[in-house]
Each structure stands twice: as C-alpha cells, then as structure tokens.
Swiss-Prot record:
Protein's name according to its UniProt entry: Cyanate hydratase
Record keywords: Lyase
Gene of this entry: CYN
Sample GO molecular function, one term: DNA binding
Highest taxon above the source species: Eukaryota
Reaction(s) this enzyme catalyzes, per UniProt: cyanate + hydrogencarbonate + 3 H(+) = NH4(+) + 2 CO2
Function according to Swiss-Prot or TrEMBL: Catalyzes the reaction of cyanate with bicarbonate to produce ammonia and carbon dioxide.
EC number(s) from the headed UniProt entry: 4.2.1.104
Lineage: Eukaryota, Viridiplantae, Streptophyta, Embryophyta, Tracheophyta
SMART domains membership: Cyanate_lyase
Protein family: Belongs to the cyanase family.
InterPro entries given in the database record: Cyanase, Cyanate_lyase_C, Cyanate_lyase_C_sf, Lambda_DNA-bd_dom_sf
Length: 168
C-alpha cells in the first residue's frame, strides 16, 4: 500500500499525469470515453481515488500510456489528503472535507478549461438541493456557480497607485 504523500507518491502522480498528457485528452474527454466524471478521472490520476478493476479496461483504452504497474498502483487504496485545519461542526466539516478532497482536481480542470485563474466567491452562486437517488434515498446536491477570474499580469503602467504618484 502506498504511504502518505512523499516522493514515491509524487513520482506516481507525475507518471500518471504524463500518461494523460501523452493521450492529448482533457479530463472530460477521458471521462466520456471511460464512463466517468471528469473530476473522478482527475482524482484517479492524482491518486485521490481508487481505480476499480471493472473500470481499468475503459480507462486504459482512454489513456493508452497507463502501464501495468501504474494501473496496479491505481488499484491500491490511495492516501487521500487535504488541509487538516477544519471546522468541527458536522455539516461544515463534511463540506470542507468534500471541497478539500476534490479541490486540487477541480483547480486543474478550471485551469484546463479556462486558463490560469480562479472561481470567484463574490460573483458566485451556490445552491443546495434535495433529490431522491436511484436507490430511493435522499441526496444532497451542492452546486457552486462562480464567475471565472483570470489572474492579471501585474504591469506597473496599470497600477493606479503608481500612476497617481507620478502625476502628483
């Protein structure tokens, strides 16, 4: 079983991401071909989810660069990690857990789809919906809908405080 973090884990993730890059496919394209969500594909390739044996053939077909040893490592239970400084109220704890656990993959997909930037938490919509699952049990749906904000190049001639000082 793979230990928590460390050089070995980072090396495996680098190899998995290299196989993805070789495929020249986005997380979404791989997901469509493999019958998985794009976030789950990213989770698998970042070693934050365990590849199930029945899913391996479809993923290998979508990402031909996945070697036997990489697939074997992906089938081991991963060391899932996120920032440990969390709030202890159960609902907030679980929401933080979900955001922290999937955050790195979501960030990579945002960068892949939009470029270098972030989702606004100001021009932002969030909804919590109750739906009934296929098994008849209640399900919680949390939707984050935020405006994309690209990072700015920090040009001195665009910095108003400097422009104001020069004209004074």
């Amino acid at each position: 079983m793979e230990g928590g973090g460390g050089e070995r884990a980072a090396g495996v993730v680098r190899r998995l991401m290299a196989a993805k890059a070789e495929s020249r496919k986005s997380f979404s394209e791989i997901g469509e071909e493999a019958g998985l969500t794009n976030v789950y594909v990213a989770q698998l390739l970042r070693r934050q989810a365990q590849l199930k044996p029945e899913t391996a053939p479809a993923l290998r077909a979508a990402v031909p660069g996945l070697t036997d040893d990489l697939v074997a490592l992906m089938m081991e239970p991963p060391f899932r990690s996120y920032h440990p400084d969390i709030v202890h109220e159960p609902a907030i704890y679980r929401l933080n857990e979900a955001v922290m656990h999937f955050g790195e993959s979501i960030k990579e997909i945002i960068n892949e789809e939009f470029g270098d930037g972030i989702m606004s938490a100001i021009d932002f919509y969030c909804s919590v919906d109750k739906v009934q699952g296929a098994d008849g049990k209640d399900r919680v749906v949390v939707t984050f809908d935020g405006k994309y904000l690209p990072y700015s190049e920090q040009r001195s001639d665009h910095m108003m405080s400097r422009l104001t000082r020069k004209t004074s």
